[in-house]
């Protein structure tokens, strides 16, 4: 085993090497939107998923609507159609299982409905604004954001949140990256836009399983919220 630098050890017979670990200060926090800073309980997308599937003639339960929460909304719809219970009801209704054409159609129908109701579910969660202000003003951290919402949806939330005193330094929407949660790309995009490195100096906060995985996939700290969990 050879000492390459003061922080890296390399074994020529191995495909792997030992690397240093960051032990410095936290420099940035990336927060999810619905269920983390506003819309306690994440009702906004859930009620729209219910409406979209009801319109298709295949009603779903609130539990089914919530299960994939955190994903890009088109992916969310696709995951609902892959649930055995939903597939069974779809087959009973149409004599076939749901396909990608159905997913695309439902997503097209979902978008205007979601944008239309976002303001009805845009109340900041108690303590969120105060917490972010403390992180920014007292700990001098940069504030980023990720979401399963698309850019037009985030634009609606920006205005509603800013009127309540919340404005992240960075916004990244699900349609700005090759693949959204649980993939790491939105976190990495935040790191670039916040100009924060290393990635280990960032904490990702979310109320969904995919949102927590997004942080761990990116290589940063990841914190899950329970009381507002979807």
Where are these regions (language model features)?
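Short catalytic-loop micro-motif centered on adjacent basic/acidic residues
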Residues: 63, 144-145
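Structural motif
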Residues: 68, 146-148, 205
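Asp-based, Mg2+/Mn2+-dependent phosphohydrolase catalytic module
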Residues: 1-28, 129, 133-139, 150-230
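N-terminal helical cap/lid subdomain that shapes the substrate entry/recognition surface
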Residues: 8-15, 19-129, 133, 137, ...
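Short glycine-rich or small-residue beta-strand-to-loop segments that form or flank ligand, phosphate
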Residues: 30-31, 142-144
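Residue-level detector of anion-binding/catalytic polar loops
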Residues: 59, 142, 221
């Amino acid at each position: 085993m050879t000492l390459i630098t003061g922080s890296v050890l390399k074994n020529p017979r191995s495909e792997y090497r030992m690397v240093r670990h960051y032990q410095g200060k936290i420099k940035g926090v990336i927060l999810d939107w619905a269920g983390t800073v506003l819309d306690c309980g994440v009702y906004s997308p859930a009620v729209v998923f219910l409406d979209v599937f009801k319109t298709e003639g295949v009603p779903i339960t609130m539990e089914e609507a919530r299960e994939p929460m955190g994903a890009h909304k088109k992916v969310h719809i696709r995951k609902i159609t892959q649930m055995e219970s939903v597939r069974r009801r779809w087959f009973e209704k149409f004599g076939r299982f749901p396909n990608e054409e159905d997913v695309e159609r439902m997503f097209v129908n979902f978008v205007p409905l979601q944008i239309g109701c976002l303001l009805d579910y845009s109340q900041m969660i108690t303590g969120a604004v105060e917490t972010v202000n403390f992180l920014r003003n007292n700990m001098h951290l940069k504030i980023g954001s990720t979401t399963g919402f698309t850019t037009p949806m985030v634009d609606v939330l920006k205005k509603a949140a800013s009127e309540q005193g919340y404005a992240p330094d960075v916004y990244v929407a699900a349609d700005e990256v090759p693949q959204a949660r649980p993939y790491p790309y939105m976190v990495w995009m935040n790191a670039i836009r916040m100009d924060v490195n290393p990635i280990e100096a960032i904490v990702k906060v979310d109320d969904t399983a995919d949102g927590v995985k997004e942080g761990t996939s990116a290589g940063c700290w990841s914190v899950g919220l329970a009381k507002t969990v979807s």
